[in-house]
């Protein structure tokens, strides 16, 4: 889950696993896999950072250990 802020200043928590698309035109709009849209104050880069941190937290995004696979 990631915490984001509506344009009216109200914070809310969103399940990042259901995010399908993030657009900026000019406000950041998050579209979920069910088609529901949320317009938030955070810019696209901030939302992407929150998603990556969430994925690392739940271990979907493994941290690079610097281990190279043999060719």
From Swiss-Prot:
Disruption phenotype: Mutation abolishes swarming motility, reduces swimming speed and torque of tethered flagella. It does not affect flagellar assembly, flagellar number or surfactant production. It holds the Pfam family FlbD. InterPro entries: SwrD-like. It comes from the Bacteria. GO terms for biological process: bacterial-type flagellum-dependent swarming motility. Coiled coil: none annotated. Required for swarming motility. Increases flagellar power, probably via the flagellar stator components MotA and MotB. This is Swarming motility protein SwrD.
